[in-house]
């Protein structure tokens, strides 16, 4: 089966930012390695580098392992903001009980609607969009910050997303777009050992990606006509048109359950219809 390799994967010059560097100094990339992210920021009055925006819709069962993994991050230079999409499973009560910063929406606005609210509420230079059904590796936040700070022309960084229950398999290594017009997840279902090289990609998978926040003011936010799928391909494409890069960083790893944030009830708009929306905006050179 073809790997659909193309020029994006062959020309990356950001490898120094997301390779397997020995003796990596996280202080240079994050600035704060002690204490809980939100609490430490409030104590010092120092603005954090990144806000982790977590969209949630009836995902209470995923909350505890996700937040436990975030609490164990080596890099602490982040705030957390949950955007709840009108959950009815006890998520609202749990978030309030845990005193986790959150915005509570009255109804389900879809993935794009929720993350747009979070992006506009964030005051940090970078924003990580993170599905609730993920468990980030200890080094995840630090590696993502280091990667995006390698160049002001990097709009987004996609992590190495691995299947939680089959860790030998990839879930996503960035999104690609073939010459035949098909969008696809790079690496899905393949050996996770084969995706250890940094490269350019067409767009980052928004389930666990970091973005340069100010660029959204230039290119626009996630298109809310994409209720749950292909919204990341669309925004990544707009960034490329504006002259920015999207890259894959293999040293930033996240373990993903799958369909936690979205799922069939959360996705009334078929992916094929979403693809038509992307193509309707396409510019061919």
Mark where each language-model region is.
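Short, acidic, metal-binding catalytic loop of nucleotide-sugar glycosyltransferases
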Residues: 68-77
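A conserved acidic beta->alpha catalytic loop
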Residues: 69, 84-92, 107
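Glycine-rich, basic loop-to-helix element that forms the pyrophosphate-binding segment
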Residues: 105-122, 132, 143
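Short aromatic/hydrophobic "clamp" motif used to bind/position activated sugar donors
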Residues: 127
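Conserved donor NDP-sugar-binding/catalytic core segment of glycosyltransferases
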Residues: 134-178
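Short, flexible, basic/aromatic active-site loop/helix in glycosyltransferases
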Residues: 178-201
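A short, conserved alpha-helix in the catalytic core of glycosyltransferases
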Residues: 202-253
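Active-site-adjacent helix/loop segment of glycosyltransferases
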Residues: 246-285
């Amino acid at each position: 089966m073809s790997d659909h390799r193309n020029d994006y994967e062959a020309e990356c010059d950001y490898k120094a930012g997301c390779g397997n560097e020995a003796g990596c100094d996280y202080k240079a990339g994050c600035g704060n390695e002690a204490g809980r992210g939100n609490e430490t920021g409030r104590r010092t009055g120092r603005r954090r580098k990144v806000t982790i925006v977590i969209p949630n819709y009836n995902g209470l069962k995923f909350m505890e392992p996700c937040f436990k993994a975030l609490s164990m991050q080596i890099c602490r230079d982040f705030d957390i903001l949950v955007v709840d999409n009108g959950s009815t499973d006890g998520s609202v009560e749990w978030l309030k009980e845990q005193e986790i910063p959150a915005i509570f929406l009255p109804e389900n606005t879809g993935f794009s609607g929720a993350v747009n609210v979070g992006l506009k509420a964030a005051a940090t230079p970078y924003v990580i969009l993170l599905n609730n059904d993920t468990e980030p590796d200890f080094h995840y936040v630090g590696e993502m910050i280091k990667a995006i700070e390698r160049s002001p022309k990097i709009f987004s960084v996609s992590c190495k997303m691995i299947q939680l229950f089959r860790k030998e398999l990839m879930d996503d290594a960035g999104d690609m777009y073939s010459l035949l017009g098909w969008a696809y997840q790079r690496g899905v279902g393949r050996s996770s050992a084969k995706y250890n090289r940094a490269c350019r990609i067409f767009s980052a998978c928004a389930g666990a990606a970091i973005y340069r926040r100010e660029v959204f003011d230039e290119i626009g936010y996630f298109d809310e006509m994409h209720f749950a799928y292909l919204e990341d391909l669309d925004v990544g494409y707009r960034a490329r048109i504006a002259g920015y890069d999207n890259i894959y960083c293999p040293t930033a790893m996240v373990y993903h359950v799958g369909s936690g944030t979205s799922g069939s009830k959360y996705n009334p708009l078929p992916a094929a219809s979403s693809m038509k929306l992307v193509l309707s905006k396409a510019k061919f050179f």
